[in-house]
Regions:
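Pre-Walker A adenine-sensing motif
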Residues: 12-24
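Conserved nucleotide-binding/hydrolysis micro-motifs of P-loop NTPases
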Residues: 65-70, 97-102, 129-132, 164, ...
Length: 190
């Protein structure tokens, strides 16, 4: 019988969540944080990001939201988990709105690749992934394009050994989307 490969678990920093997850999230996994608007997806992502980010495992937060990262940070600073000392050191925020507005998913992927190569993060967050999906709908064959984008993103993040989180507004578990076919884990908020 072959020996099982041990998967390292990353503590989320969220009280009670690690116990539910069997000790934390699997390292190098590709995860989705989903739920309706206002349910706390971005706050949960930030709490996990600040808990996981370190000089050895930097975090990259790619935002496609309409609001600038500065406004988002202003609200997140109200929480105890927020650590101003990690900003632009262990935690980097990058705005992908310009690329998303082109509707070209290849352009969005190129920018993500460039940022990951430059910063070599151990943890990557894309918020809001639904904005990327909606931007990609301006292309001709949207389903094929989105499926290709998702597969490429999942393969690249895995090869770079980055634990990845896609944050998205989904209203029901049955919302059809290619993201569900590549996600290793799903955290559904209500």
């Amino acid at each position: 019988m072959t020996e099982k490969v041990k998967i390292n678990r990353l503590p989320t920093g969220v009280p009670g969540l690690d116990e539910v997850l069997g000790g934390g999230l699997p390292e190098f996994s590709f995860n989705l944080i989903a739920g309706p608007p206002g349910c706390g997806k971005t706050t949960l992502a930030h709490q996990m990001m600040f808990a996981l980010a370190s000089p050895e495992r930097p975090a990259l937060y790619l935002t496609v939201l309409g609001e600038p990262p500065l406004k988002m940070l202003r609200y997140q600073q109200q929480f105890d988990f927020f650590d101003d000392g990690k900003i632009n050191r262990s935690v980097r925020f990058v705005n992908l709105s310009d690329e998303a507005l082109t509707g070209n998913l290849d352009e969005v992927l190129r920018r993500i690749v460039a940022e990951v190569k430059e910063h070599t993060p151990g943890v990557v967050f894309v918020d809001s992934f639904r904005s990327v999906v909606l931007a990609g709908k301006t292309q001709g064959d949207q389903h094929h394009s989105l499926q290709h984008f998702m597969q490429q993103l999942a393969v690249l993040m895995t090869s770079w050994q980055a634990t990845t989180f896609l944050i998205g507004e989904y209203f029901t578990e049955t919302d059809a989307n290619p993201v569900f076919t590549v996600a290793d884990g799903l955290i559904w908020l209500r």
